[in-house]
Amino acid sequence: MLEDALVPDDKLIYVSPENLYYCYANDTIDQDDKWTSIQPQQGYIPILSANLRAYKIELLKKLRFSGQNNVSPSIKKEKKNLEPNKKITTKPTESTGSKKYLIPEQFIPDSLEKQLRTLTVILKDALYLGKNNRFIKENEVVSDDTRLLILDEFLKLIIPNYIDSLANWTLVDLNKGTDDESLLYLRFNESGTQSMISFYKKHSKMAKYMEIHYDTNTEKYINDNFKDDGDEDNVEAEQSHSVGEILKSMETAFEKARSQVGTFKGDINDDQDDKINYKIDYNTLLDIPSDSLEQLTKEILNFRTKVIDIEKQKQLRQQYEDNERRQKHMTQLFEKLRKGTKSNDSNRNMDIESTDTINDSDSEEDDDEEDEDDLAIEKRKEEKRKEEEARKYRALLKDYETTIEPHLHLLSQQYKQNLEYEKELAANREANVKDLLRQANDIYYDKDRSFKDREEQEDKLDREKYGDIIIEDIVIDDDRKGQKKLLEKDKKVKKAGEPAIKINLAFKKAMDNSIQDKRDKAEDIEPVSQPIEARSTNRYAALKEKRVVDELVKELLGVYEDDVVAYVFEILEKPEMSDEKKQSELVTEMEDLFDKEGAVQFAEQVFKALDEA
């Protein structure tokens, strides 16, 4: 099924409502591949694949809630043909003609042989079963099933060896105002070739009642198999006899159908025929005039069946509302359960109590809603829908007025200015010149635009004159100057008698050693940094101030734990361990609280924050 296919929700899928109705009529509604397609086809409309289920439910709901299914008569006929125990009208389907009838979609030939044995007959005048037929009274409409029975009798008269020679037939109406016609398509069996030729030979000139049409291949097929016996008089006699017999048979069929109740009641509702077969006792209507009997019969049938239809529609509507309420209640319950699993153990009891209270209130509200009238519920839903649509409309209108329209106006002005740029430049020439003069005389205006080129040129001249300066010499000279200053300071300290001689001597000795190392290695001197322990202490203090570890513990545990944070810093502040060993130990210790993956992620984030501190 296409609904279960792995189709993204934002992709298009093509559906055919007519094929869906066809599946509904033939009880194959679950076969979605018969009315959906992932490729565009003729008669299919595109929708989002995420809306496929809602679209199907909406169409089926319209089918069930309407008084009659919106299925074409041809589909209904096919459904009845698939069920041999059903009645076409009031007469059982014992005749062979009902079995030979096909809907136009199924009658289309699938081979050249079938096309050769197909004739098209245009029925007119008495043979046309529409409103202009001579046998149909005013304001009298023949039902579709009755037309099929009458045409079945008609074909038995005009086709020799009807049962064995005729394969299938179908009927298509052409509405052309007052000159209405019906197209009767006949397909003969391979053994019925002579019957087809005999039918063509007898009735090809009956232009008043019917016209026979065929394509060039069929004409060639008839001419190849046609044998002229030269007996034209007998042909005309048989033809005139056939016309009189046909007209008499048609009149008899109409009278017989008219005597059966419900045949001439207009557009018959097939769904009502399936639901109920209501019989009228005409003995109670003996006092009614004959001209009013037909209308009264219609009203009685409509009234009796309407009550049952309304009751069934109400039951379906009630069932639909109950399903919606149950679905809403289950959704709320699942939402509360999902939220309850995320809550802490300390708040779990309170959540359960509040959930019970909410469930009780929801059940009471549902009971109250069930007592309300269905019409009131529908009106309330309609009002909410209209309010939501009005709110969305106002939001869109406000966005258009405040954002889109001003932006479009600005773009329009800019476009007009660009079209008339030269005119604008000429018109504002005086103002532009004044602006340039003001900026030229402004003390803050940068008049020196080529300072970079000048500096590069001066640097090049300096290098040619003095050469490149080695960084080592500059560093050593600076160290010597610093050493000289320290010696002078030591002399002052000796004179003052302050007890800082050891510290200064040690510092002096360190400076001498550093200068000697720089001379030997010729490397850059880095500024004297703080001791490693002092730097580590500063890093841990900065990490504590940022409270990164606190946030990570709270995020992973769901609750802030002081003991866990203190234990983490206890591991980090061990002086005898390197950062790699600390990280490994932290992962090992945190596996008891978190899982393996969570412990690794926690340690990586802690040391990342420690490096940034």
Curated annotation (Swiss-Prot):
Protein name per Swiss-Prot or TrEMBL: U1 small nuclear ribonucleoprotein component SNU71
UniProt subunit comment: Component of the U1 snRNP particle, a subcomplex of the spliceosome.
Record's keyword annotation contains Transmembrane: no
Where is it located?
Answer: Cytoplasm; Nucleus
Any one Gene Ontology BP term: RNA splicing
* Gene Ontology annotations for the cellular component aspect, listed alphabetically: cytoplasm; spliceosomal complex
Which InterPro entries does the annotation name?
Answer: PWI_dom
Which parts of this chain are annotated as the region Disordered? 333-384
Write the record's keywords in alphabetical order, separated by commas: Coiled coil, Cytoplasm, mRNA processing, mRNA splicing, Nucleus, Ribonucleoprotein, RNA-binding, Spliceosome
Q: Which cysteines are joined by disulfide bonds?
A: none
Provide the GO MF annotations for this entry. RNA binding
Segments forming a coiled coil = 293-332, 367-443
The UniProt record lists the keyword Lipoprotein: no
Query: Which portions of the chain have biased composition (kind: Acidic residues)?
Result: 359-375
Q: Which domain of life is it from?
A: Eukaryota
Please state which protein family the record places this protein in: Belongs to the SNU71 family.
Its biological purpose = Component of the U1 snRNP particle, which recognizes and binds the 5'-splice site of pre-mRNA. Together with other non-snRNP factors, U1 snRNP forms the spliceosomal commitment complex, that targets pre-mRNA to the splicing pathway.
